Amino acid sequence: MSALMALEDFVDSTVTLFIQCMDELAISPPVPPSQLKDPINMAEWFQWYAFDVVGELSFSRRLGFLDSKSDVGNMKKVLDSFIQYASTVAMMPELHKFLLGNPLVAYFLSSPALVISDVTKQEIDRREADPDAVHVDIMDKIIQSQKRIGPQEFPHSEIFQHAVVNLSGGSDTTGIAMDSLIYHLLKNQPAYEKLQAEIDQAAVKGNL
């Protein structure tokens, strides 16, 4: 927890950008509300935000979801597909050898984690090209752990694996937690009103 608290400034910058995006949707939406065909998908926005937060925590940089207001590299779509596949195969593991576990199928289909893997590899390559650059993030902590433990017990491949798991797992669970929070607030009027009052009081005191 203390390690995450040290990275709080990274999260704050992404929170600020997320609020700006919400203000744009509320104050100057791309089309008038009366012309919106579908409600705004907040679950999608929350996961875009989560991807950028995890990018900041992991690599000291956003991944561009909120900046572009889009699913960068279809990472969210790919992750959703992978989760659906993994959920099914976890219940019926015998299917895996006929699907992605089949070398012929895997050859013709790109790996569900390929996009996330590419982002991670690019970051590792960037750091190896400039080893003297100072970073204060999770990737740096992983690299420092390898230096402390040694490459025999902590091989280079594990840096990649830890970073991929952090990026994919962290964004998904964070987005789901935010979805759940908003859902239950909307279902619980007293809790919603209490939170709104606390936010209003903090705004008056200049604590936001």
Q: Predicted segments — roles?
A:
Residues 4-13, 25-53, 64-74, 97-119, ...:
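Cytochrome P450
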Residues 12, 31-36, 73-81, 138, ...:
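Cytochrome P450 I-helix active-site segment
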Residues 18-21, 57, 82, 119-130, ...:
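Generic, well-ordered alpha-helical scaffold segments in large soluble proteins
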Residues 20-35, 61-65, 126-136, 191-193, ...:
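Surface-exposed helix-capping loop/turn segments at secondary-structure junctions
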Residues 41, 112-177:
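Conserved cytochrome P450 catalytic core segment spanning the I/J/K helices
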Residues 50, 173-198:
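Cytochrome P450 catalytic-core helices
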Residues 84-100, 193-204:
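Short, compositionally biased low-complexity segments
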